[in-house]
Amino acid sequence: MNSSDPYRIPGLELIDHAFEAPLDYLDPRGRQIDLFVREVRDLDPKSSEKPFLVFLQGGPGFRAPIPIQKTGWLKRALTEYRVLMYDTRGNGLSTSVDHQTLGLEGDAAAQAEYLTHFRQDNIVRDAELIRSKLSPGMPWSTIGQ
């Protein structure tokens, strides 16, 4: 896991976290992919003690929103949580899948096999990997659209 230094935008503190995860959890030492999560906190000095709330973008194919201000549901969530904006595998700053990257995987059969690793079951496994690094042994909550 690699984490950025905290940085601020008006009313918010952000920390970017990068992780490596197996492309195929049945072969954990094989090919790895990148996962990206942005931690969003309010400016309360005790915010680092709050539990995590993971935001799951409704997708498919969309990155997590980039917070630019503390309004709406995010404002409410930050009263109780640190929010993780999770770019699921295949999207955003995580290893992405698009027509260009898919073309690098070979023929149609190889491309289809590659895409089998970008389903919800692996997105959940990735989330658990992230949880094990950011808050080992602690539960977290989820929200999505």
Model region roles, listed by residue range:
Residues 2-145:
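Gly/Pro-rich cap/lid or specificity-loop segments adjacent to the active site
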